[in-house]
A protein has these predicted regions:
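Enzymes that bind and transform nitrogen-containing heteroaromatic metabolites
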Residues: 1-190
Length: 190
C-alpha cells in the first residue's frame, strides 16, 4: 500500500508559517533542492490543500520558461507538470483540471482508496490545513520534516488538535550546510 508522506519545513518550535502565513524564514539552497529533487523524482502523486495548490499553480507550470529560471526551477517545473495532483478542497471543482483530482468529501475513504491504487508513495506538500485534517484522521504514514534554525514563537503550527499520542520511528536524519536538519519519521502503528 502507498504511504502518505507529509513534506514540511518547520521552525524549531513547530510552526510551518508565521502568524500571517509568511514563510520568508525558510532556509533553502542548492544542497536542499538537489536532495529533495532526487526524492520527489521517485514519487508520482502530489497531494495539496487548496491554498498550496493554487500557490503552486501560479508559479510552477511555467517556471522553467522564465529567463531567470534556476536549475531548481527547471527541474521542479518539469516534475510538477508531469506528476498527478490530488487537491483537498470543498470549494474547487475539477471540471477543467488536467492531471488533477479534487477530493471534497469522505476524506478518509477517498484517501484510503488513493493509497490502495498502484503507484509510488504520495507526497503531501506543505498544506497545513490539509495536514491537520489528515493527522486527525490518522491518514499520514510518514513525516519528512526540514527543521529550520529559527524559533518563531507564534504562527501556524504543524500539529494542531491532536486527540491522542502518535508514536513515531526515526528513520533517517541529515544536516545541511544552511543549518536545516532533515528528519524522516514513520508513524508507528503497532
Amino acid at each position: 500500500m502507498r504511504k502518505i508522506i507529509s513534506f514540511m519545513h518547520i521552525s524549531l518550535d513547530g510552526f510551518v508559517a508565521g502568524p500571517n502565513g509568511e514563510m520568508n524564514w525558510i532556509k533553502t539552497g542548492e544542497e536542499i533542492f538537489d536532495h529533495v529533487g532526487k526524492r520527489i523524482d521517485e514519487t508520482d502523486t502530489a497531494l495539496y490543500g487548496r491554498v498550496t495548490y493554487q500557490m503552486m499553480e501560479d508559479y510552477w507550470p511555467t517556471a522553467a520558461d522564465k529567463p531567470t529560471a534556476t536549475k531548481h526551477d527547471i527541474e521542479h517545473s518539469k516534475w510538477y507538470n508531469k506528476v498527478y495532483k490530488v487537491v483537498l478542497s470543498k470549494s474547487m471543482k475539477d471540471t477543467s483540471l488536467t492531471n488533477t483530482k479534487i477530493i471534497s468529501d469522505n476524506l478518509s475513504d477517498r484517501i484510503n482508496e488513493l493509497k490502495q491504487q498502484a503507484g509510488e508513495d504520495i507526497l503531501l506538500f506543505g498544506s497545513p490545513r490539509a495536514t491537520h485534517s489528515l493527522i486527525q484522521q490518522n491518514l499520514i504514514d510518514c513525516y519528512w520534516l526540514f527543521v529550520n534554525p529559527i524559533i518563531l514563537g507564534q504562527g501556524i503550527p504543524l500539529f494542531e488538535d491532536i486527540k491522542g499520542k502518535i508514536k513515531l520511528k526515526l528513520l533517517t536524519t541529515r544536516h545541511f550546510n544552511c543549518g536545516v536538519t532533515e528528519l524522516n519519521y514513520l508513524v508507528d502503528r503497532q
